[in-house]
C-alpha cells in the first residue's frame, strides 16, 4: 500500500489537470460520419467528444460506433458514411466531470475510461481529464515524496 504523505495532490481539482477544450479534437452533432471518421483517423484517437455550435457536450463518437453503423449483411457499406449524422450514432450516456470536481473523483472515473469529458455549470465543454495525465501527475508526486 502506498502512503501519500502530502495532501496537496489530493486537494486539487479536475480543472487543474485537464487538457483544455481548444486542444481537443471534436466533431459537431450535425457532422456526417465521413467527417467524424476522418477526424478520428487523422488524430489517431478511438473516440472524441461531440459538441453543438455552443460547445455544449452531447456525447462521444468512436470508430467502432461508426463501423458498426455501416456494416451490411455481406459488405461494409461505405456509401452510408455521408448519409448518417454523428448524432444518430453517438453515445450519449457518458461519464462526465465538472471542472471543479475533486481530483479523486476523476481518478476513479479514469480507471475504466481512457478519458472523461469535463464541463462547466452550463454543460459547456471545458476539456478532457485523461488517464495519462493522472498517471503522469501521480508519478511526479510519488517521486517527490521519495526524495
Curated annotation (Swiss-Prot):
InterPro entries for this protein: CBS_CbpB, CBS_dom_sf, Diverse_CBS-Domain
Coiled-coil stretches: none
CDD domains in the cross-refs: CBS_pair_bac
Stretches assigned to the CBS domain: 18-78
Annotated control of activity: Binds c-di-AMP. Binding of c-di-AMP to DarB inhibits the interaction with RelA and PYC.
Keywords: CBS domain
Main function: Involved in the c-di-AMP-dependent regulation of the bacterial stringent response. Modulates the activities of at least two enzymes under conditions of potassium limitation. Apo-DarB regulates the activity of the GTP pyrophosphokinase RelA by interacting directly with RelA, leading to stimulation of (p)ppGpp synthesis and induction of the stringent response.
Domain notes: No conformational changes occur upon c-di-AMP binding.
Subunit-structure text: Homodimer. Forms a homodimer with a parallel, head-to-head assembly of the monomers. Under conditions of potassium starvation and corresponding low c-di-AMP levels, apo-DarB specifically interacts with the N-terminal region of the RelA. Under the same conditions, apo-DarB also specifically interacts with the C-terminal part of the pyruvate carboxylase.
Name of this chain's protein: Cyclic di-AMP receptor B
Taxonomy of the source species: Bacteria, Bacillati, Bacillota, Bacilli, Bacillales
